[in-house]
């Protein structure tokens, strides 16, 4: 299976820069997109041979996730079942025959770590969601986790320490 996960940071701009050419060229079985920044009806992608699943944020121009897959899933879930989080369009889950595929755009803690408490609540709730899925069958998680695990993951680790996504 060929799976591509990509934070597009605005799908409309990405389409203008050749997304569809890339999409056709790589011919992946599954595309998981994060930070689509779309509202329903803002874009109509013609992707023959793919099923499309979109989760939009209520806030215009904010977050959003999507999965395009050649194989139709058994079921689809949007969000993680926690109202506090689900209005931001951060998760799409496909139930395939042998596994769950979860596309996620994890919240950023923001400058000055203003949203760190929310992020920690998100982490607990998302972990519980994944553990619940894992009790039934395997889970594949892909997406933008908004975290740098080690200094090597950052261009400027010293100046980024204690910034969103890189805290002790």
Regions found by a protein language model. Give the residues of each.
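N-terminal, active-site-proximal structural segment of metallo-dependent hydrolase catalytic domains
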Residues: 1-47, 57, 62, 78
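Active-site-proximal beta-strand elements of phosphoester/diester hydrolases
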Residues: 1-9, 98-110, 142
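Active-site beta-strand/loop signature of hydrolases that rely on acidic residues for catalysis
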Residues: 7, 23-41, 101, 130-151
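Conserved CoA-thioester-binding segment of acyl-CoA-metabolizing enzymes
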Residues: 17-20, 117-127
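Structured beta-strand-rich core segments of catalytic domains in phosphoester-bond hydrolases
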Residues: 37, 42-109
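Short catalytic/ligand-binding loop motif for oxyanion handling, primarily in non-cytosolic enzymes
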Residues: 40-42, 62, 110-113, 148-157
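Metal-dependent phosphoesterases centered on the DNase I-like endonuclease/exonuclease/phosphatase
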Residues: 51, 125-168
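Surface-exposed cleft-lining segments at the edges of enzyme active sites
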Residues: 81-82, 107-123, 158-163
